[in-house]
Amino acid sequence: MSYSDVSPAEVKQRLRQEALSRRADLSHVFRIEASLSLADHVDQLRLADGCIVAGFWPIRDEIDPRPLLDALRKKGHRLCLPVVAEPHLIFRELTRETEFVSAGFGTQAPSPDAAELRPDVLLMPLAAFDCSGNRIGYGKGHYDMAISALEQSGPLDCVGLAYCVQEMSDVPAEPHDKPMDGILTEMGFRRF
């Protein structure tokens, strides 16, 4: 069966499963080295001084952005993490003093006491991506909705974080899908 015989949602589900399987097959040592390499590529992002960067706390076998977030903090950027809220994600400040609470999805988020920030740069987890900046998330649409809301108040640079093995030749984009502006993998940064 060709992909032309199925809906974009079905194609995405198949690609998501394939990419997550590839990611799961990576060795523990490779995952650690890849996560550390993100920080080595921090200057390739070419971020404006003092911008606010939204990261994420990794779940399952996602590439770990914490070394990159530490490198960004050392360069003077303010950091924040997503919190699932209605109608879309909000972002709370991440500092060394931040207290965390359980945030669902097996992750932690800053407590409600942390300041809510509007990021200039959004670092996003993903299941799969292609060379045009299309991404497949985990199917809930949290980041697509957050991007739509954030873009109402100004420019937003959306950067996916992933392992190279998560790249697919072509990811279908539906009208509600928000493309990335760039991707950062263990091999470096690419702008779309």
Where are these regions (language model features)?
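Short glycine-rich anion-binding loops that position phosphate/pyrophosphate groups of nucleotides
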Residues: 58-61, 127-131
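A structured binding-face within diverse protein domains that lines the active/interaction site
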Residues: 109-110, 125-128
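N-terminal active-site beta-alpha-beta segment that forms phosphate/nucleotide-binding
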Residues: 2-117
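Short, well-ordered strand-loop elements centered on a beta-strand within folded domains, enriched
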Residues: 87-93, 134-136, 158
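Surface-exposed, charge/polar-rich loops and edge strands
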Residues: 1-10, 14, 21-24, 113, ...
